[in-house]
Amino acid sequence: MKQNRRDFLKTSGLAAGTALLGGLSNNLFANKYINTMKSGKMKFRFRPYTLELKHVFTVAEASRSTTPIMLTEIEYEGVTGYGEASMPPYLGESHATATEFLSKVDLSRYSNPFDLDDILSDIDAIAPGNPAAKASVDIALHDLVGKLMNQPWFNIWGYDKNKTPNTTFTIGIDKPDVVRKKTQEAVSGSEGFKILKVKLGLDNDKEMIETIRSVTNVPLTVDANQGWKDKEKAIDMIHWLKEHNVVFVEQPMPKTMVDENAWVTEHSPLPTMGDEAVQRLVDVPKAHGVYSGINIKLMKSTGMREAQKMLILARSLGMKVMIGCMTETSCAVSAASQLSPKVDWADLDGNLLVSNDIYKGTTVVNGKVTLTDLPGVGITKI
């Protein structure tokens, strides 16, 4: 049977990517780390928290001024790792669903926190779905293990902290005067953003871009959040965006419109990035040939462990990679930033959009993701 272009790309690249993932060791750690661990038990705790946003945040799906999150802790031999689940309402998780899931997590039966794969596989098997709740355990466990090793995760993975990219700052859909104000704050503020991300997908797309261009000419990225429904109009819009110094377009059309997204990618003068269409590792080969690249978010991928596997597989398939976030504290943003030295683009501004962060960690200096040398995910509690 004759294969179409998308199926050929998918099958030809998948074998190589799967082989590469199969070569990953199930245990990153030398015996000297494992053998020095005591035989204590891990204690797991969680509590609900609500992030207050600095501004009402509007995307194609909805608007909100708060984000429910769950804060997690794993304690072992006097050392505590911190984690987080960020749960924007439109994604389907909540304080109630996270409480139900996390109440089933029992880490007391594990004596060795370095058994990351086994522990996280068991967590994943508790129930389907719940990616953010699962990520909160994953992040806390990674933070704990990094602290026990006295190493940040970018160093454990062998990444160069000096190769982090610039991060975007997100401008949500809003009235022109608000957009102008947010844009001016972003480009003239202490972080010195060199690239902005613009939420589109409604009827005022061109007005949004033109309003921003009245303030600054810095490069832009665009996230349509599945808002465009006609592929011909989407292509016309992308050509117009290219003329206005846009670098790439995220999720141009609904994730269910697979053939239409593939057509847009084939005809687009800009890279397209799958976001809502790419949740976990299994989705990466499906996105190959449909999008130019993928947007990895810990709250979709169930955490750092699977996110790194997604990064490796996407690279083996020749795809572009960006690392993104939800509105989060510096805990989850710093965890995601550990992967940033290996991506093309970063969208790690979620902690900068909230007014009640309870951690300090990764910062933005002259527009660039700047990692700390603190062990684990690189955070301290405020």
Tell me what each language-model feature is.
Residues 153-268:
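Metal-dependent enolase-superfamily TIM-barrel catalytic cores that perform enediolate-based chemistry
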Residues 7-29:
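N-terminal export signals
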Residues 13, 39-51, 69, 77, ...:
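Flexible C-terminal active-site loop/helix
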Residues 24-55, 75:
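C-terminal segment of N-terminal export signals and the immediately downstream linker at the start
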Residues 72, 78, 137, 150, ...:
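Conserved, mostly hydrophobic/aromatic
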Residues 38-46, 62, 75, 80-148:
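Metal- or metallocofactor-binding catalytic centers and their adjacent structured scaffolds
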Residues 1-4:
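N-terminal secretory signal peptides
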Residues 256-261, 267-273, 277-348:
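Catalytic alpha/beta core domains of metabolic enzymes, predominantly
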